[in-house]
A protein has these predicted regions:
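Amide-donor transfer/coupling interface in amidating biosynthetic enzymes
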Residues: 73-77, 102-232
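Amphipathic, alpha-helical segments enriched in basic
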Residues: 4, 47-51, 92, 175, ...
Length: 232
């Protein structure tokens, strides 16, 4: 089993994710510069947080049009897993690999703080080590993290089946007050139609060691590894 963490110009969470995967989760992981592409076979790819290309045009818009994303699409069409975190989630949305878009927060400021999430599904490659309804605590750090689903049609209906995480309060209540950025129905983690691509705004790598105050995010990565082990 081998993971790749793709580095774009402006990525700044790439080494954090690689450290958690390699050193904390024990998953062999390579840092891959985007111009090199996925030159070997990988079981999973992570697009990390940061500010790829300075977030010019729109967050993730330029990175989504780089050649390495052709490799990511091929992996997603097969049996591989793709996780996009924060800026990586924006890139996945811009690439059309998940439905909807991530746009400027309802209160248009950068938000950086812990957030509570409710696990909406535990039958996905990214959440299989959680239980549906679990409340987890993972930091957020974004200005363009407000999720908006497709305007109409089948893709809009698909979103209701593709929600992995919602913002909530400490007791699991999904309320307007627990929604830090104005996301539609508090959605902050959305899956592809096939379920093997996840875009999430919170940073699980920042909640993967006790010293960081929470280990809740580690189960995202360990779920991916477990899924690949079971389905290899």
């Amino acid at each position: 089993m081998r993971f790749a963490v793709v580095q774009f110009g402006g990525s700044n969470c790439d080494r954090d994710v690689a450290y958690i995967l390699n050193e904390v989760c024990g998953i062999d992981t390579d840092l891959v510069w985007y111009k090199e592409g996925l030159s070997r076979a990988y079981d999973a790819v992570v697009l990390p947080g940061g500010f790829s290309y300075g977030d010019y045009l729109r967050a993730g818009a330029i990175a989504a049009r780089t050649r390495v994303m052709d490799d990511v699409r091929r992996l997603a069409r097969g049996s591989g897993l793709v996780l996009g975190i924060c800026n990586g989630a924006q890139i996945l949305a811009e690439s059309g690999l998940v439905p909807g878009v991530f746009t400027v927060n309802a209160y248009p400021k950068f938000i950086c703080r812990p957030a509570y999430l409710r696990v909406e599904r535990s039958d996905t490659p990214f959440t299989m080590l959680y239980a549906t309804g679990d409340v987890i605590r993972i930091p957020i750090a974004h200005r363009e993290g407000r999720y908006i689903p497709p305007a109409s049609g089948s893709n809009r209906r698909l979103v209701t089946e593709s929600i992995a995480f919602r913002f909530c309060d400490a007791h699991g209540n999904v309320t307007p007050e627990s929604n830090p950025n104005g996301s539609h129905e508090n959605i902050t983690g959305v899956l592809s139609a096939a379920g093997n691509v996840l875009a999430m705004m919170p940073h699980p790598e920042r909640a993967s060691e006790d010293i960081l105050g929470s280990c809740d995010g580690r189960l995202v990565f360990l779920s991916m590894a477990r899924y690949l082990e079971v389905n290899s």
